[in-house]
UniProtKB/Swiss-Prot annotation:
It comes from Arabidopsis thaliana. Disulfide bonds: none annotated. This is WD repeat-containing protein VIP3. Keywords: Cytoplasm, Flowering, Nucleus, Repeat, Transcription, Transcription regulation, WD repeat. InterPro entries: G-protein_beta_WD-40_rep (IPR020472), SKI8 (IPR051510), WD40/YVTN_repeat-like_dom_sf (IPR015943), WD40_repeat_CS (IPR019775), WD40_repeat_dom_sf (IPR036322), WD40_rpt (IPR001680). SMART domains: WD40.
Length: 321
């Protein structure tokens, strides 16, 4: 397995690019790449040339996260303006606008069947679940705070929720916090199953293995990528190689590799059998906020693709084989 650079667009946005995700292919079009920036816009790109399809506006502050519905028809963008905008991918028509208190909208992900949008709730130490048929808030999964914190105790603020991930079967939801803990919930019962440990700094990114719903990967400011058994509450391994914060982690569709983006300005590819980094890409000259593998499917799809975005305002696309 390896990465090969295909195309990079300098100044793809007018400010730092914090988010990237792929919109799955539909019957009418191939998969598209979505990027979100502090310039308050979301852009749609057509691979492999990274041709700009459209620029979406609608936020009054920077875009912090993106999520694509598995149907490929709609997507969501969250902003530090505390709004989540749900829109039609092909027309940019607004489907819904979800409002949250300040600092309440960070990571997001649609449930694998598309029935729920999970939004990491920031300082509320919770994950909000929104029904995608009615766009109503249907549940709040709360993270336990320390008992009776003193007024001067800052521990509760460390429960700030940064990241969220669904298991492939939709039965489990994991969220990562500022204090380094990861909570795993049974979604049907709205019950906290357990907390996973292994990091001592913010967990900014989570992803489940697409081939094993028990395996969860986490990236943290401690520079490590951890591999957990999310059911057995076991740390399966810890991988290191980045020289600074791990800001993003994503799993390849074949389940054989993960990619990470870091504030050390690199993208790394990790072989999961070796549990080691096997390649480092240095396309960016500032921290890499997001990496995203293209999902499988679609007519005429060639080899695998990985995208990365950075504070340097650029977007890079790689061949994964």
């Amino acid at each position: 397995m390896k990465l090969a650079g295909l195309k990079s667009i300098e100044n793809a946005h007018e400010d730092s690019v914090w988010a990237a995700t792929w919109v799955p292919a539909t019957e009418d079009r191939p998969a598209l790449l979505l990027t979100g920036s502090l310039d308050e816009t979301v852009k749609l790109w057509r691979p492999d040339e990274l041709d700009l399809v459209r620029t979406n506006t609608g936020h009054s502050l920077g875009v912090a996260a993106l999520a694509a519905h598995p149907s490929g028809i709609i997507a969501a963008s969250s902003s530090i303006d505390s709004f989540v905008r749900v829109f039609d991918v092909d027309t940019n028509a607004t489907i819904a606008v979800l409002e949250a208190p300040p600092s309440e909208v960070w990571g997001m992900q649609f449930e694998p069947k598309g029935t729920i949008l999970a939004v990491a709730g920031g300082s509320s130490a919770s994950v909000k679940l929104w029904d995608t048929a009615s766009w109503r808030l249907i549940s709040t999964l709360s993270i336990p705070r320390p008992d009776a914190p003193k007024p001067s105790d800052k521990t509760s603020s460390k429960k700030f929720v940064l990241s969220v991930a669904w298991s492939p079967n939709g039965k489990r939801l994991a969220c990562g916090s500022m204090d380094g803990t990861i909570c795993v919930f049974d979604v049907d019962r709205s019950k906290l199953l357990h907390q996973l440990e292994g990091h001592n700094m913010p967990v900014r990114s989570l992803v489940f293995s697409p081939v094993d719903p028990r395996v969860l990967f986490s990236g943290s400011d401690d520079g490590h990528v951890n591999m957990h058994d999310a059911e057995g509450k076991t740390l399966l391994g810890s991988m290191s190689g980045h020289t600074s914060w791990v800001l993003s982690v994503d799993a390849s569709p074949d389940g054989g590799a993960i990619a990470t983006g870091s504030s050390d300005r690199t993208v790394r590819l990790w072989d999961l059998k070796m549990r080691a980094a096997i390649q480092t890409m240095s396309n960016h000259n500032d921290q890499v906020w997001s990496v995203a593998f293209r999902p499988p499917g679609g007519t005429g799809v060639r080899a695998g693709r990985l995208a990365s975005v950075s504070d340097d305002k650029s977007v890079s696309l790689y061949d994964y084989s």
